[in-house]
Structures are given as structure tokens and as C-alpha cells.
Amino acid sequence: MPTVNQLVRLGRKPQKKKTNVPALQACPQRRGVCTRVYTTTPKKPNSALRKVARVRLTNGHEVSAYIPGEGHNLQEHSVVLIRGGRVKDLPGVRYHILRGSLDTQGVKDRKQGRSKYGAKRPK
């Protein structure tokens, strides 16, 4: 507990909040190159094969990023854009790949929620 004199001299320092997405370095998105594209299984009550890519970012960080939507065209050396946002049942996956930008195609035949999956408006 500080004294009144210490508070007058130094004041209170605001506590810094730890970021959930350190590799983005306060940017909304980051570009990177896929080093490995693979599937992995989720945590205990769930069961699936989740699509994940290991991405080397332009700032040198290497992160795991989730590939949302049904089907994708990513392979090694694909250039992708990642955003923050974790996948709750995949430990260590804190980023999402943005569909429909750079080398990532949008989800085919997507009718609803298209903007999140980079799908064009159906004719």
C-alpha cells in the first residue's frame, strides 16, 4: 500500500492488458506463407477433422491458423491473410485465415453469411 506522498510523486500506473494475438503486432491482419496444411482433431467432447495451416508471417512469426468453411484450395507456399480469433476446441490455434483474399478462394455455393467466407453473390 503506497503512502500519500508516493502517490503524489509517482501516481498509479495503468495495468497493461496482455493481447490474445501477439503475432499480429497490433495490426488487423497479417500476410503470410503456408508452410504446412494439415487436419487435426478437436478437444474432448467434439469429434471432427479440423483443417489447419501452419503460416510463416511477414514479421517472422510462425503460427497455426484455422481454415474456415467447407473445402479449400490451400497448399504449401500459398500466400494467405490471417486475422485474430481462436478456435475454442483446437488448443494453440489463435488465428483464422481470411477466405477470398490473396491465394485463398471463397467457399463455393455459399448462400448465407457469404461475406465471412469470401463468396460472391449467386446470380
Curated annotation (Swiss-Prot):
CDD domains: Ribosomal_S12 (cd03368). InterPro entries: NA-bd_OB-fold, Ribosomal_uS12, Ribosomal_uS12_bac. It comes from the Bacteria. Residues 102-123 are annotated as: Disordered. Residues 113-123 have a biased composition (Basic residues). GO terms for cellular component: small ribosomal subunit. GO terms for biological process: translation. GO terms for molecular function: rRNA binding; structural constituent of ribosome; tRNA binding. With S4 and S5 plays an important role in translational accuracy. NCBIfam families: rpsL_bact (TIGR00981). Part of the 30S ribosomal subunit. Contacts proteins S8 and S17. May interact with IF1 in the 30S initiation complex. This is Small ribosomal subunit protein uS12. It comes from Magnetococcus marinus (strain ATCC BAA-1437 / JCM 17883 / MC-1).
